[in-house]
């Protein structure tokens, strides 16, 4: 019985620290230092939540920039279905899937002459990616300019405005948040 008391007191102490103090402290610090990020990086227009800067949305119309394909096919960009869902490079199903995506992109973007950027035909690891490169966004400009009756220059400037540089200059590449870019595109129509 004498050996049980130290084990029980250690258990209760660690339970208090890891189950109470640590979660409350990290939540409080997150809310204090990073309130926007700690609350989901929600994009708001007035009182309406339009999306999250962290999760892509299924923009399918010709007047919108399209993001990376969602790996959660039945319900695109569903965070509850997220996970390692990409097929292996050696899987013949991946070739068929990419060929179908290429054909769909070519059909939707007949005026685009350059080769299709790889991120427009491959899903990210989570299947929820909200970012593409500025080059992938620029590849879609002819379709969007035609659908929205906007100039190529207007769309190029919009992409440049919403492009984010990597935190460290030589590590990573610039990206464009598709949700923010498409919401800005809708504001041009107002």
From Swiss-Prot:
As for membrane topology, the entry says: Single-pass membrane protein
Where in the cell? Cell inner membrane
List the record's Gene Ontology CC terms alphabetically.
plasma membrane
Q: Which InterPro entries match?
A: KdpC
Q: So which domain of life are we looking at?
A: Bacteria
Does Iron-sulfur show up as a keyword for this record? no
Q: List, in alphabetical order, the Gene Ontology terms for molecular function in this entry.
A: ATP binding; P-type potassium transmembrane transporter activity
Q: Mind listing the UniProt keywords for this protein, alphabetically?
A: ATP-binding, Cell inner membrane, Cell membrane, Ion transport, Membrane, Nucleotide-binding, Potassium, Potassium transport, Transmembrane, Transmembrane helix, Transport
Listed transmembrane segments: 10-30
**Assembly state and interactors?**
The system is composed of three essential subunits: KdpA, KdpB and KdpC.
Q: What does this protein do?
A: Part of the high-affinity ATP-driven potassium transport (or Kdp) system, which catalyzes the hydrolysis of ATP coupled with the electrogenic transport of potassium into the cytoplasm. This subunit acts as a catalytic chaperone that increases the ATP-binding affinity of the ATP-hydrolyzing subunit KdpB by the formation of a transient KdpB/KdpC/ATP ternary complex.
Q: Tell me which family the UniProt entry assigns to this protein.
A: Belongs to the KdpC family.
Report the PANTHER family cross-referenced here.
POTASSIUM-TRANSPORTING ATPASE C CHAIN, POTASSIUM-TRANSPORTING ATPASE KDPC SUBUNIT
Quote the protein name from its UniProt record: Potassium-transporting ATPase KdpC subunit
Organism whose genome encodes this protein: Shigella sonnei (strain Ss046)
What gene does this protein come from? Answer: kdpC
